[in-house]
Amino acid sequence: MLQYPHINPVALQLGPIKIHWYGLMYLLGIFAGWYLTRYRAKVKPWAPIKPEQVGDLTFYVALGVILGGRIGYIIFYNLPYYFHNPSQMFFLWDGGMSFHGGFIGVLIAFALFARKIGANFFDLGEFVAPVIPIGLGAGRIGNFINGELLGKVTDSPLGMVFPTGGPLPRYPSQLFEFFFEGVVLFSVLWLVTIKKRPRYLVLGLFMFLYGYARFICEFFRQPDPQYGYIFFNWMTMGQILSIPMILLGAVILIAVFIKTRKNKCENI
């Protein structure tokens, strides 16, 4: 059995002000995304934005992630609770963010920013997609430190007793998602960007691989208590929300493959 590290969710306290690791992980993900996107804007001749525009894009994306992630969590996962406890909607440090809601928020942010600078929406998505897994991985570390989004009870050697999860060992599902949705997905997308490739290949890969990784990792996560299993006595809300991403990613990849076969797909 693995040993839980017992990290205090509060990284720093200055009088009544508490700085949580959960928030710091989001800040780390946003900063790393800004740094790598700015680097890519300098070295990629096809970049749809200039290096000096990356700061503004990061601001748009950060708002999309925070607002979309929180609103998505409230709507998709716990609407009745927040309906009766509206003040709790603003307690972000207690956790409660939805990737799928954040993804929708980022799409809206991309659309607004692309319109502002006169860029192509899909080119912007293709350009930013390789750095998104960094934020995903950082967020999962925040979930782990918070002791939330717990895994299922297990007798596997990978089990871990969480202080918030009772006396039985559970899968550290947050670390599984950190590895597959963060480390593996970033590595794959970054390697693909090193060489010339068909336009929108990375965008399609991101959507398909993230949706697939999330769908599989959900089998190790405890279902959300307010929903449990929604279909077939095994499908969770996270899996349901991942299916559209898998399908849309597959459609993009098929379209890229067809255009490549016909020599009509531009390489970048």
UniProtKB/Swiss-Prot annotation:
- Its name, as the record gives it, is Phosphatidylglycerol--prolipoprotein diacylglyceryl transferase
What Gene Ontology terms describe what this protein does at the molecular function level? phosphatidylglycerol-prolipoprotein diacylglyceryl transferase activity
Q: What PANTHER family does its record include?
A: PHOSPHATIDYLGLYCEROL--PROLIPOPROTEIN DIACYLGLYCERYL TRANSFERASE, PROLIPOPROTEIN DIACYLGLYCERYL TRANSFERASE
Q: Does the keyword Glycoprotein apply?
A: no
Question: Topology in the membrane?
Answer: Multi-pass membrane protein
GO biological process annotations for this chain's record? lipoprotein biosynthetic process
Q: One of this protein's Pfam families, by short name?
A: LGT
* Transmembrane segment boundaries: 14-34, 57-77, 90-110, 117-137, 174-194, 200-220, 238-258
EC number(s) on file: 2.5.1.145
The record's similarity note reads: Belongs to the Lgt family.
Enzyme category, top tier: transferase
- Annotated pathway: Protein modification; lipoprotein biosynthesis (diacylglyceryl transfer)
Q: Where in the cell is it found?
A: Cell inner membrane
Q: What would be one Gene Ontology cellular-component term for the protein?
A: plasma membrane
- Determine if Kinase is one of this entry's keywords: no
Binding positions (a 1,2-diacyl-sn-glycero-3-phospho-(1'-sn-glycerol)): 140
Q: Which domain of life is it from?
A: Bacteria
Q: Keywords of this protein's UniProt record, alphabetized?
A: Cell inner membrane, Cell membrane, Membrane, Transferase, Transmembrane, Transmembrane helix
Protein function: Catalyzes the transfer of the diacylglyceryl group from phosphatidylglycerol to the sulfhydryl group of the N-terminal cysteine of a prolipoprotein, the first step in the formation of mature lipoproteins.
